[in-house]
Every structure is written in C-alpha cells, then in structure tokens.
C-alpha cells in the first residue's frame, strides 16, 4: 500500500509545508544544544524535503528517506544538495549518523504492512545502533487525542490550482482512517484522485518506554522551540549516552 501519490504529494508541499518550515528553527536549536552542528542527519519520512533543505543550508549532510516516489522527486528539486532515497523507514538500511529525525507523525502511518508496535521497537534499536555517542533521535507522533472520537471530522483546503477534502474517522481505540480526495488542475480541467491513509496512534508512555529499553535517555517535547505541536501530536527526544567524538 502506497500513499502520497503525485497529486497529493504536490498538494502537501504546496499547501501544507508550514509544519516542517515552522519547526525547522527549533529543531536546529535542539541539534546545536547537543553539540551537533555538522555531520550526517537522516530524515525518516522526509516528504518533499523542506526540512532537509533547511538542514543543508545550516551546513549538515542529509539523507532523506520516504516511501513515496512522488515525494522524493519533489525533494530532489527542493533540496538538490541533499541525498534522497525511496524506502520504508521500517526496513531501510540506516548509515552511521549524528542525528535521526522523523517529523510530521511519520511513525503512525501504516503504508508498510510491517508498521506497528513491534516494528517500532526494532526501529528504535536500529537507530540507536547507528547513532554516534551523544547522537539524538527527534520525532513526533499522533496520540489518542488525534482521534475524532468516532465522529466524522472533515477538512477542506484549496490553493491556486488544487483543492483537497479529508474525512477522518476513528477506527477502533488506537487508529484513525483518513479518506482524502484531491483535485488538481491539469490544463483546463481538474483531475480527481483518492487516497486512504490508516494511522496507528501511540501513547507517549509507550514510545518513551520503548526508547528507554533501546538504550536512549528520553525527554518529552511539547514542540520544537517556539513551534508548538497541534492537538494530538506529541514529541520525544532520544539521546544516546556517551561523549561526542566529532
């Protein structure tokens, strides 16, 4: 199952890039506060590369990974000096690095059938192994308050050459389903496409416990610097113990 095909990827970048762009200054300050002012940052679920572009401008090397080929095509245009590859964050080979980020509830998406609580534990262990001592993992995720509590929630947005309608419904106590209809102008007509996204919701306590079991020291976050998370989004900072060597 794939998500963020060509039209939704375009719309997400055109109309919803603010999350990554607004979070970037706070994210950079967190990196710097832990002595990470250069080196390789791996961005899991990099989307259209807006955060990767900010990292490159700040002097970091960047590897962005996303399951959507359409997003990766956009990212290569947005941040041509970064490296990108198509892949699932649940299975892609991670290189040794100084920091790993996953911004915008990427850990919740169930495009890959391997996604889930057990896979999350494996992912955190993989990240811990590849991080340099003193390296960090920064991520945010959707929790139970992201659910509309079994009431249908609809959202409509539009731009110069696009429109999108998303309907979100709870699917059991720990997941939500989004039905997304996109309309994108192609020539003199609008093309309609549909996608269905399923997200598994996580409690902050279970994320923190899994990180600690993987070896991280853990801090919870309400946002990245001055950028505050919207309702239902929570963040964590995982720190690999040890002195930085670079």
Predicted regions and their residues:
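A short glycine-rich, Lys/Arg-flanked "PGG" loop and its adjoining helix->strand segment in the class I
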Residues: 118-133
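SAM-dependent methyltransferase
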Residues: 138-209
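A short SAM/SAH-binding and catalytic strip from SAM-dependent methyltransferases
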Residues: 98-118
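A short acidic, Gly/Pro-enriched loop at the edge of an enzyme's catalytic core
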Residues: 90-99
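Conserved class I S-adenosyl-L-methionine
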Residues: 1-36, 38-45
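Class I SAM-dependent methyltransferase SAM/SAH-binding core
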Residues: 49-91
């Amino acid at each position: 199952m794939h998500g963020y095909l060509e039209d939704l990827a375009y719309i997400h970048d055109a109309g919803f890039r603010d999350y990554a762009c607004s979070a970037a200054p706070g994210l950079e300050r967190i990196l710097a506060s832990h002595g990470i002012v250069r080196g390789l940052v791996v961005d899991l679920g990099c989307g259209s590369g807006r955060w990767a572009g900010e990292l490159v401008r700040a002097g970091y090397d960047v590897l962005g990974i996303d399951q959507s080929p359409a997003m990766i095509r956009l990212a290569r245009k947005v941040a041509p000096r970064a490296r990108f590859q198509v892949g699932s964050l649940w299975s892609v080979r991670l290189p040794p690095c100084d920091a790993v980020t996953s911004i915008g509830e990427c850990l919740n998406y169930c495009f890959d059938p391997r996604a889930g609580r057990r896979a999350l534990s494996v992912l955190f262990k993989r990240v811990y192994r590849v991080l340099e001592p003193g390296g960090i993992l920064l991520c945010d995720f959707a929790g139970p308050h992201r659910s509309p509590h079994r009431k249908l929630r609809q959202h409509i947005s539009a731009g110069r050459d696009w429109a999108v309608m998303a309907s979100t419904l709870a699917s059991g106590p720990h997941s939500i389903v989004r039905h997304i209809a996109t309309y994108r102008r192609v020539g003199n007509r609008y093309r309609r496409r549909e996608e269905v996204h399923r997200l598994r919701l996580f409690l902050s306590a279970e994320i923190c416990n899994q990180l600690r079991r993987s070896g991280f020291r853990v801090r919870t976050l309400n946002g990245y610097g001055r950028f505050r998370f919207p309702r239902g989004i929570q963040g964590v900072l995982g720190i690999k113990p040890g002195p930085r060597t670079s």
